[in-house]
Amino acid sequence: MANFKLIYQILMLLDKYLDHDDPDWSKLSAEHFRVTEKRFKHIMLMLYEAGYIDGIELIPLGGNAYDFKPINPSITLRGMEYLEENTTMKKAYRLLKGIKDITPRI
């Protein structure tokens, strides 16, 4: 579950930065999101490979290991769609949970 929260937070940050002329890239870090460097890099690489983000350069470390270098990170249309779908799903979940809380026999 923590991975999906991190994915959502990274995409939200990149979406927010679309409106900034000079984004604070220090916030795009493991330290900012309070996760390990290893987890952060892994999630960033997955987001890139899935087409949710762009603007990073992959650096092969040998074998299946990669690092990345941010060039001009940005959210893609696919990343925006992910945010929209997950925001809608959260709203639907809250609505259904609220209905269940009000009418416990249903």
Feature names for model-found ranges:
Residues 2-32:
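Short amphipathic alpha-helical interface segments
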Residues 3-4, 21-22, 37, 89, ...:
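Alpha-helix N-cap/helix-initiation sites
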Residues 4-8, 38-41, 50, 73, ...:
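Non-catalytic, well-ordered alpha-helical scaffold segments
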Residues 11-17, 47, 83-86:
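Generic structural signal for hydrophobic core residues of well-folded globular domains
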Residues 25-30, 59-66:
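Short, surface-exposed loop/turn segments at secondary-structure junctions
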Residues 34-58, 69-70:
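Short amphipathic alpha-helical interaction segments
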Residues 62, 66-98:
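Short, amphipathic alpha-helical interaction segments positioned at domain boundaries
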Residues 99-106:
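Short acidic DE-rich linear segments
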